Amino acid sequence: MDQNPNYNFGYGQAYGSGTDHTSDSTNNYNWASQWSQPESAASLATHTFPQYVSQQQQQQQQQAQQQAQNTYAAMNPISTFMQQQQRAQTFPQKKYGQQGGAPKPSAIRNNNFGAFGGGHALSQEWVQPMSQNQMGGPQGNRFFNNQKGGPFNQNKPNWRQNKPKGPAAPKKFDSTGKSPAMLLHELFKDVSEEYTEVEGVPKKYCCTLKVNGRTFQMESVNKKAAKQKCSELVVRDLRPDVHVTPFEEGVAAKAAAPVKKEIDAASGNGQNNKRNLLQADAISNQPTPKKVSAVKKAKLQLTPVESALSLLDLMQKIIAESAEKYSPVFEASEVPKDPEIPEVEVKKEEVDTNGENVANEKKSGWRKNETMHNVTLKFVEQNKQYTKMGPSRGVLKDMVIREALRDLFNVSHADITTVARRHASNRLGHDTTILQCLNTICSILNCTLTIECEPAEDRPLGIGRAYFMAKCTIIDHNENDLKFEVKSSSLASKAMAKDWVAQETLKNYFAIDPSSCVKTDAVSSQGPCALLHAMLNKQTKQKCKIAYEFKDNVPPVAGQATTTFYCECVIDETDRYIGVGRSKKLAKSEAAMQALKKLFKIDYDPAGNYPLALTSRAMTESKVSPLCRHIAEFCKREYHQMTEYYQIPPSNLFAAFLLVNAQEEKRVLAMGSSIQYIVEPDTLSGANGTSLLHLDAIILARRAMLKAFIHELSTVDSECSIFEKKEEGKAALKPNLRLVLYSNYSPPCIHAVDDAATKKLSYVTPTNLTCVPDDVLTYEQIKETKSLRVHCTADKLFKWNTLGIQGALLSNVLHPIFIDNIFFGSEAPVSDESLSYALQGRLGPNENEREIIVESMPVQMRMHMGISHLWHRGVDSVETLDYNTGRTSKGSPSRVCKAEIFEAYRKLNGVDQAVVNYAKAKEMASEYQYEKKVFYEKLEAAGLGKWQTKPAELVDSFTLAAFD
């Protein structure tokens, strides 16, 4: 089981918008109150020439107008009022007749009401053209006057020609889809607003609006809600004629269910034909169906154990369902301190890296005695009383409730455990830590908990922090004192070790998974900006200064239709992270996500959960695999033991190659330590392969490993060899072995990462890395300029991961050998994904079929340099080097120089002894040379630059005779 589980912290953010419900309590005019309605033909018919009307006639006309409005609302299929009206309403006849016109219809049908098609199932923006059957005639009973007078060329009455025009009706203000604040600023131009913070818990804000010389105030939990509520108050007070949608916090409108279209004369299949009219008439003439009351399904009744959220809730539910009367009363009191008990002196001892106690660094202090409490639960009617004493009143309260449930209500231990587990799961992650949760549930369930922490046996050697191991022991008194133990591996701190054992105990013994115990409404509601603030404050234990700066006057990108916004997230005025988006909000969120990825190694996912029960240090540590941590400690221990044995000053600039078998057993092949240095070209002239060109910890370890490979090839026929013979005669690494590279520091790769400004191959200069040019230096140019272009370590690792680490010479006797894992013992300046891209993925994901795992430890390490030295398996000494000459400190050729490797290679069985030239021996590996040529061509095609090869006459054109 992974000892550091990788948690997906979480977040869920509800996006949605919609209009709030209307203030109408009956909800009869919900749709009509939000949209302005057009005047129907029935309402237009009431606008006639003014004449004397008696009081009785006025009442009749008002009733007719009200009845017409009700009829129009009834014809509206979206309005809920229409669903309550089952029978069509009729209009009364006018007192006066129409000269030369047909009489008014006595009833209005649903399918041809008004000029705006009120019987349509949905209110369309475009009104379909009416057919002849709809416009007039005996079927529709509708007539429109022509230019000569009434219908069918009848004369128009004279009294209509002199009808006076009344004043224009005021334009109705449309408040559809507008919030109270929007209405406020549209209706009133002179508005001043002011916000003040209201003291109290929770914190509130007061919004003060001054409009037309009047002052209005409202309070809410945030400024936005306070302004919306205050704006609603202003509009309702100063403009009562305007409909205001009430503002409610946290209410999102849900999508309405699709309304099935009804068949009427104005709709159907988009054609106005006689069949549609007949269908509409048939539907309108059908009798009104009787409402059938739906049979209510019986609600599922949960038992108190199934629904209780805590032990107190369980007891209250049982009492509510019980016929007997129970009156529980809690009493809590503080136990008086005994003056005779003195305060305890506590001494803390610091442990150095060698595990010895440092006497002069002891820190002493005084710890006050814990305050004890008495908690009592009384049942007066039953004459029962339960009392517990301890330091925590909350835990004591749960303990007395448990005793009452077991004794008085006969609740089983399994049911109490179920409710206690549910209670702990709900609290874990937002108001209790893992240790607090474990301590609480153990106290409630009558279990004895003991957590011990001590320095780990595999503590790191040399300069570094000590590692710790924790052991958690539980004795369950409900199960005949059953004992359960969990031990952690070596972790970087006591807190992390305790968190780990507590987490495993909750998961394996109490069936509580801390990774899934997330309060969705508190944690998941946070966006990337809020999550960044919370995690930074939790990490630094203080409020960090975070600012978001938007870049103005950014020129638009050619061919891009939308505007792009840029935002910088500035943390403590030093670190800057840039985000880009189509809006300022998206750019700000992107900048926060970049900061989360760089600082906490979190790829933000809106659908994920991010529990904050663990500390940020524990979250970062949980990203590291156990193999990476074990390899790092194993290599450090082996290196320091080697330097101590050979009396070599240690350095933390070292790298090692090792093999790991299926049983996770490890064997070191080679180690190297050195600063990065390039030997001068004059030193190589006439050296004949006896001088090292590039000194670096990884480069020296790789050359030493080649020498170890040659030593293992001499014993390839034995069972203990790491190689096995293939049919074609070449040897191959056994399939159960994995080659692992470990280095304390990651190689510089500023031009090789995926987000580099210029993605190019680079070579080493005395101060930094420089992008390669488009040409290669010749031998004469090197002699003239006295400069070499040697590729950086990251480029060489990229080449080895593509062609094999064995090189051209050993490809004559070996199949390609590739690195399986690359681990770095300190935190890299870039993410692990960028490192993996630089070391294996620069040509695309399809070019390299092998997956190489690249990881780095989240540890800050101070560089400590020493002399250059190396060691490999098969020799009993450490070789020290002089980086100025590329030879040993005594001036002799290094055992890993090209000449020494070539001489050891020629001693292998099956090697052509006639070939004494080093360059010619490398050319004999035809398959490797072909793959190398293709690799160089792909680099140029990808725009990464030209590989800087060195002239053969400078480094490879030597023979063993010349060397002797």
From Swiss-Prot:
Subcellular location: Nucleus; Cytoplasm
GO CC annotation terms, alphabetical: cytoplasm; cytosolic ribosome; nucleolus; nucleus
Region of interest (Disordered), residue spans: 1-31, 86-105, 149-176
Biased composition (Polar residues): 149-161
Pfam families assigned: A_deamin, dsrm
Entry GO MF terms: adenosine deaminase activity; mRNA binding
SS bond list: none
Tissue specificity field: Expression begins early in embryogenesis where it is detected in late gastrula and comma stage embryos. By the comma stage, expression is highest in developing neuronal tissue in the head, tail and ventral side. Neuronal expression continues through embryogenesis and, by the L1 larval stage, is the prominent pattern. Expressed in most, if not all, cells of the nervous system at all larval stages and in adult animals. Also expressed in the developing vulva but not expressed in the adult vulva.
Mitochondrion is among the record's keywords: no
PANTHER family linked: A TO I EDITASE DOMAIN-CONTAINING PROTEIN-RELATED, EUKARYOTE SPECIFIC DSRNA BINDING PROTEIN
Assembly, per entry: Interacts with double-stranded RNA-specific adenosine deaminase adr-2.
More details: Can prevent somatic transgenes from inducing gene silencing via the RNA interference pathway. This may occur due to A-to-I editing of transgene-derived dsRNA, preventing transgene RNAi.
Annotated protein name in UniProt: A-to-I RNA editing regulator adr-1
Source organism (scientific name): Caenorhabditis elegans
